[in-house]
Amino acid sequence: MKKVFSVEEIKEIESREFRKRGGDSFSLMVNAGVNCAKKIIKLVKKKPIIIVCGPGNNGGDGFIIGNYLHEKEYKVEVFCLQKKYYKGDALKAFKKLKIKTQNISKFKARKNSVIIDCIFGTGLNKPISGTLKSVILRMNKLNKIISIDIPSGINGDTGKILGCAVKAHTTLALHAKKIGHTLNPGKKFSRKIIVVDIGISKKFNYK
């Protein structure tokens, strides 16, 4: 069974799982968010949490994580884009969010908080610039950052930095490691990698 996958292979594995679920992709996002939140609880105990959400499904995972931690009585702040930038499952997760959000441009680093990086996942294919680059540079001033799936700004296939990248303390890889986790600088930026089971059948890992 393979243990490290390309971005395209992960997309195919997810597509097979969606078909098995009758096209229900949102339930997989919920699994990913909830299971990541459970890992976060084990890693950080009761520290304040700041979740930074980008425009895609990685941001959607962040909204699910935020709700779960909020229900467990964690102090949670969510910084994200405006609603118009979300679609599909990410928009669905945004609408279900029970926490008041703040605009991502207003993000401020706080030394006593743990940052959850949900800005970009493995689907990023162009350099980060503008506001999101500024946010990442501010995030990197902190020691404790947990990235969801891959540090934002790291190419999932090459490990290269796309404009800038989050320097994670821990990376929660969804379902399996990606090639970008194993190649520098992606390997260095991912630091400690924990694979999180998100409910995808392991039989799809076989070619």
Predicted regions and their residues:
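A near-ubiquitous, low-amplitude feature marking generic local secondary-structure context
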Residues: 15, 19, 52, 80, ...
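YjeF_N-associated NAD(P)HX repair module
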Residues: 2-5, 112-207
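Short, surface-exposed, charged/polar-biased interaction segments
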Residues: 31-34, 57, 136-137, 192-193
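Positively charged, low-complexity intrinsically disordered leader regions
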Residues: 1-46, 201-207
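Conserved active-site and cofactor/substrate-binding residues in soluble primary-metabolism enzymes
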Residues: 5-8, 23-35, 60, 88, ...
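Hydrophobic aliphatic residue packing
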Residues: 10, 36, 76-78, 116, ...
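Nucleotide and nucleotide-moiety/phosphate-recognizing core
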Residues: 38-119, 127-148
